[in-house]
Structure formats: structure tokens, C-alpha cells
Amino acid sequence: MINEQLFNLYASRIQGINALYADLDAKGIKDYAGPLLPYCWEQKYLESKFRLVIFGQETNGWYCDYMNTEEEISKNIGMYKDFRLGTYYNSLFWQYAHRFNMELNGIDDLNFVWMNVNKFGSDSGVGKPEQAVLDDEVKYYNLLAEELAILKPDVCLFLTGPNYDQDIARKLTDVEFHSLCEFGEREAVRLSSRYLPRHSYRTYHPGYGNRISETYQRILNAILSDCKSSN
């Protein structure tokens, strides 16, 4: 079962996250929230035409307690489950994520998985935490490749924008970025890595993409077409 495998992964890395906490405590760094640990509605996900994982940048606030017991891991995952993929939120990110899933799969009913490139975000505002937090995540708590191995997605869509390409590369060290159709490298790229499915793409975060909505929709349509034409 996917959720059991994810839980076992997180439980096996308690030592790593404790090392992260200890290092950040020693540096006096407290302004961070996370980690974001996903839950999968397994039957819906597995029965979808395309098993889809959509990536954001980092959470805007999240779990803020030390997460170093199995009980706290369960509590963290429960927060994700209760969030229900932003069902009760009307942000641009969730509007575009749900629309893409609907257009890809013909149904949008908790049947994709949401993750973030960075598991930790700032606790006091929006955006990345301090660089030391990002560095320690890579050093002590880089789980992305293992999460992908468990989820086995058919499509990965990174709605992260070009300024997060380096964050992706730090998590998946063999990743390469390739041109996609007629779009410039900042607009949209195809990603290749032994950890990623063939259909892996990065484009703008909806917060920016919606400002250039005509171009953004062309990009998303091109990605959808590429997924469907070579499935």
C-alpha cells in the first residue's frame, strides 16, 4: 500500500530529521515550517488514467512542531489528508492544479498527489526559508527520489517556475532540463531523471502564469497534448 510505504519511509528517517532540528537549533534558526508529508487517496490515484503528481514550491506555513515520533508523523500526514488538496481554498495554485488534473484525467476527485520541491517553507511569511534550512533538508532529509519510487507517477508537473530549477537539481542530482515545443527555457521545459517518469514538466507557478494567462494556457495545453499523444 502506498500510504503504508510512505509512512515507513518517514519513520525510517526520524534520525535524519532530528539531525536537521539539532543543526538549526544550534544556529538559532526557528523561522521554518514543515515538513510537508503527502497522503495518497490510493484507489482514486491508481485508477486514474494518468497517475499525476503536481509539485508546488514550498508550503505557506504548515506543521510547526518537531516531528520526531511516529505519532507526530501520523499527525502531520493527517493534516495533509484533512487539507483535501486545497478543496476549500481558491488560490490560483489550486485552481490551475485541479483544472489540469480534470483535463488530463477527465475527473478531479482527490485522484492526484500534491508535493512541494522544498518540504520546508518560511513560518513567518511566504516563500523559501533561510538557506540553512534548504541546505539541511538536502543533507539530512532529502526523500524525493524515494517518494517518487513509491508513488510511481505517470506524469509529474512542476508548477514551480525557473527559479526553483536549482532546488529540483539538488534533490534529484541527475536531472536534466530539455526544451519543450517552441517555449523558452524559463517558460517550460521537460525534465529527465532516472527518478522521474517520461512525462515530467516544469512551467511557471500559477501566481505568475496567470498574469500571462494566454501564454500560460498554451504551455499547459502543450503539456496535456504531449502526455496524451505519447501515452
Spans of features found by a protein language model:
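Signature of the catalytic double-stranded beta-helix
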Residues: 78-108
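Beta-strand-turn-beta hairpins that frame and shape the catalytic cleft
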Residues: 47-52, 105-110, 190-201
